[in-house]
């Protein structure tokens, strides 16, 4: 058992933890009944682990929204300390803990869930597969990394070559994401996740915005877009005046359901020259917050913890079970 201090923080949740000789969850905003349910759930998991004594977790909650994030945080601690591969999978309003295709435990919300909802086919819920409304393999890779941690298999439109391109004629991120998700869902009868993401640069009045992918023209490439952006900011010398935000809007659409919408932003600055070999799009010229590091210098797992898309997916996972239950 290590002395490592673990931390997870976003705008809705903030947890700090370490492995100790006992199980303890304390802090703000968590009902005592919820803490007891989580402890009971994870005590069952602990009984299956081959740990050296003492064993246990000590978690302080600074900010709390839902049990999904808290359970995921504790399981991540357990996985790192024990080299296990326990997955946390939200399903039909419940939270499943699984490893090696075996169900270890189930967290039920207050009031439980109906058996019809729980055992519904994947066409009526996320199931095991998510269809992402994009042919962009870079974007798909990010979603695959994010959803893979939650036990989902990701498909994209390259798996369905017969589907038409959906024109992004909207003037906002939400309009474009809705167009893609709702059109593809109508054509396939599947649950579809679409995103519209872009870079908003304050000195350019929010541009390139919804035109981020084609900022340099109809034959735009990542390199051309980055070059145009740096050219537009050539006379802006102070970093604080080169502030920018990556923005993501996610929309989940399914037949006969109201669509679900979440948004997130990742603040930073535009560099004066590209740097880094990872990521795609504007990552080489985007400085992450006050870190001085470019997004293209981050490994995938680091980026997913911080990025606009990672934040949006975590928001989506927080609200999806309630949306699914309401729409069923």
Curated annotation (Swiss-Prot):
**UniProt keywords, alphabetically:** Hydrolase, Magnesium, Metal-binding, Nucleotide metabolism, Nucleotide-binding
Q: Where is this region: NTP pyrophosphatase?
A: 130-324
- Which CDD domains has this protein been placed in? HAM1
Question: EC number(s) on record?
Answer: 3.6.1.66
Q: Which residues are Mg(2+)-binding?
A: 196
Q: Which cysteines are joined by disulfide bonds?
A: none
Which residues are listed for substrate binding in this entry?
A: 134-139, 197, 280-283, 303, 308-309
The Gene Ontology biological process terms listed for this entry are: nucleotide metabolic process; purine nucleoside triphosphate catabolic process
- For the keyword Signal, the answer is no
Catalytic residues, per the record, are 196
Q: Which Pfam families match?
A: Ham1p_like (PF01725)
Tell me which cofactor or cofactors this protein depends on: Mg(2+)
A Gene Ontology molecular function term for this protein is: ITP diphosphatase activity
Listed under GO cellular component are:
cytosol
Cofactor detail note = Binds 1 Mg(2+) ion per subunit.
Reaction catalysed? XTP + H2O = XMP + diphosphate + H(+); dITP + H2O = dIMP + diphosphate + H(+); ITP + H2O = IMP + diphosphate + H(+)
Assigned protein family: Belongs to the HAM1 NTPase family.
Summarize subunit and interaction data from the UniProt record for this chain.
Homodimer.
Q: What does this protein do?
A: Pyrophosphatase that catalyzes the hydrolysis of nucleoside triphosphates to their monophosphate derivatives, with a high preference for the non-canonical purine nucleotides XTP (xanthosine triphosphate), dITP (deoxyinosine triphosphate) and ITP. Seems to function as a house-cleaning enzyme that removes non-canonical purine nucleotides from the nucleotide pool, thus preventing their incorporation into DNA/RNA and avoiding chromosomal lesions.
Q: What is this protein called?
A: dITP/XTP pyrophosphatase
């Amino acid at each position: 058992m290590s002395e490592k201090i673990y931390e997870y923080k976003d705008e809705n949740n903030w947890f700090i933890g370490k492995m100790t000789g006992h199980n303890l969850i304390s802090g703000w905003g968590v009902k005592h009944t919820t803490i007891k349910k989580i402890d009971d759930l994870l005590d069952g998991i602990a009984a299956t682990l081959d740990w050296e004594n003492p064993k246990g977790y000590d978690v302080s909650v600074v900010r709390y929204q839902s049990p999904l994030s808290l359970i995921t945080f504790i399981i991540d601690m357990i996985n790192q300390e024990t080299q296990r591969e326990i997955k946390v999978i939200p399903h039909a309003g419940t939270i499943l803990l699984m490893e090696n295709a075996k169900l270890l435990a189930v967290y039920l919300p207050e009031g439980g869930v109906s058996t019809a909802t729980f055992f519904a086919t994947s066409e009526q819920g996320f199931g095991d597969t998510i269809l992402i409304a994009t042919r962009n393999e870079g974007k798909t890779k990010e979603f695959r990394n994010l959803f893979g941690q939650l036990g989902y298999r990701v498909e994209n439109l390259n798996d369905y070559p017969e589907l038409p391109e959906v024109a992004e004629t909207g003037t906002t991120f939400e309009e474009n994401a809705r167009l893609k998700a709702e059109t593809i869902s109508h054509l396939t009868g599947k649950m579809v996740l679409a995103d519209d993401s872009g870079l908003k640069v304050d000195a350019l009045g929010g541009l390139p915005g919804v035109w981020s992918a084609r900022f340099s023209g109809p034959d735009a490439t990542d390199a051309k877009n980055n070059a145009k952006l740096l050219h537009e900011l050539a006379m802006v010398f102070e970093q604080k005046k080169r502030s920018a935000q990556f923005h993501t809007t996610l929309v989940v659409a399914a037949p006969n359901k109201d669509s679900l919408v979440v948004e997130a932003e990742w603040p930073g600055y535009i560099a004066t020259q590209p740097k880094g070999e990872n990521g795609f799009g504007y990552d080489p010229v985007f400085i992450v917050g006050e870190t001085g590091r470019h997004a293209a210098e981050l490994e995938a797992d680091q980026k997913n913890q911080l990025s606009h898309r990672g934040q949006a997916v975590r928001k989506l996972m927080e609200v999806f079970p309630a949306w699914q239950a309401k729409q069923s």
